[in-house]
Design a protein with these regions (language model features):
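Conserved catalytic motifs of ABC-family nucleotide-binding domains
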Residues: 63
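ABC ATPase "signature
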Residues: 125-126
């Protein structure tokens, strides 16, 4: 039943920050993720999109080098998905972000490198353009279908 700010401060404290440092980190990350206006809202009362932003902010408050996001936009409406994409774009170059998704446009839009798997086996790894080129497909969706329908490397 913690507020947005209390959640962020709690995570910072768990990672060794003093109360003052935790407050400063919370304020900074709330500004980064546009959560400042929601700082006194209870986390459980936030919409799905705001909850995802808070979750990512909580994960980042300890300054990790790698962040894993498993289907972060599943179940979000188009507007919330696009807002979260903007949040993820802000992270580029600051840490390694590993994202799992079933949304092809999300992978194509956000990823520097994409790994297509089929039945747990890596089929291809590269940029969206490289995957399209090596597959001979007209677009990324067609390339994805080629790699996943065949189940073998092209």
């Amino acid at each position: 039943k913690l507020t947005v700010k209390e959640n962020l401060m709690m995570i910072a404290r768990l990672h060794g920050s003093s109360k003052q440092e935790a407050r400063e980190k919370a304020d900074k990350i709330m500004a980064t993720f546009e959560l400042t206006d929601r700082k006194n809202d209870r986390a459980k009362q936030l919409s799905g999109g705001w909850q995802r932003k808070l979750s990512i902010a909580m994960a980042l408050i300890s300054n990790p080098k790698i962040l894993f996001l498993d289907e972060p936009t599943i179940g979000l409406d188009v507007r919330a998905r696009r807002e979260l994409w903007g949040t993820m774009e802000k992270l580029k170059g600051k840490l390694t972000l590993i994202l799992t998704t079933h949304y092809l446009e999300e992978a194509e839009e956000l990823a520097d490198r994409i790994c297509i798997m089929d039945k747990g086996i890596v089929q291809v790894l590269g940029t969206a353009d490289e995957i399209i080129k090596v597959s001979g497909a007209r677009n990324f969706e067609e390339a994805f279908l080629m790699y996943t329908e065949r189940g073998t490397e092209l």
